[in-house]
Amino acid sequence: MLEIFDVSYEELMDMRSDDLYRLRKKTFKDRLQWAVNCSNDMEFDEYDNPNTRYLLGIYGNQLICSVRFIELHRPNMITHTFNAQFDDIILPEGNYIESSRFFVDKSGAKTLLGNRYPISYVLFLAVINYTRHHKHTGIYTIVSRAMLTILKRSGWQFDVIKEAFVSEKERIYLLRLPVDKHNQALLASQVNQVLQGSDSALLAWPISLPVIPELV
């Protein structure tokens, strides 16, 4: 089974921090060539701290995917790292969270889960399930153009708050991701087209979904 669950920063330090930071370096520095700081073949920053929670997707004791969350009222990438691009946006008060460092280890997912396993959509669904379980109102996030395309394909009915440029050629987008039952059902339907899981499994938190041999 593919298991996706949440851990605190302290729990991450005890179990998977090196794995996570190495995969983030592999994803964001090596593959996407983002301007991120790395040390000892790992990527981490000031937002990896005790105020942060992480989703970890594990299969066969191997980390496949992850995303991190910070409460929106705390320092985050919208209010600090990309403040120059989004300082004109008034973020809402209330129980919102910011998400960042969303990634799937493509080579690991292909080897362990298969080419057709909808791992990005499963992680999107897990994000909604987590957010609803913890009674957060919604999510704000900054994404690249490539991630914007993946989100559009998923069917998630998000709002683009603002488009900005970090360089002459590189655009980024501030999004509001709703976590209502309608969007949860849309993502569950996308996943169910391939995995054919039960509603109780698809809408649960933590989430545990089968890996189908014929997809590997």
From Swiss-Prot:
It comes from the Bacteria. InterPro entries: Acyl_CoA_acyltransferase, Autoind_synth_CS, Autoind_synthase. PROSITE patterns: AUTOINDUCER_SYNTH_1 (PS00949), AUTOINDUCER_SYNTH_2 (PS51187). Its EC number is 2.3.1.184. Keywords: Autoinducer synthesis, Quorum sensing, S-adenosyl-L-methionine, Transferase. GO terms for biological process: quorum sensing; signal transduction. GO terms for molecular function: N-acyl homoserine lactone synthase activity. It holds the Pfam family Autoind_synth. It catalyses: a fatty acyl-[ACP] + S-adenosyl-L-methionine = an N-acyl-L-homoserine lactone + S-methyl-5'-thioadenosine + holo-[ACP] + H(+). It is an enzyme of class 2 (transferase). Belongs to the autoinducer synthase family. Required for the synthesis of an acyl-HSL autoinducer that binds to YukR and which is involved in the regulation of motility and morphology. This is Acyl-homoserine-lactone synthase.
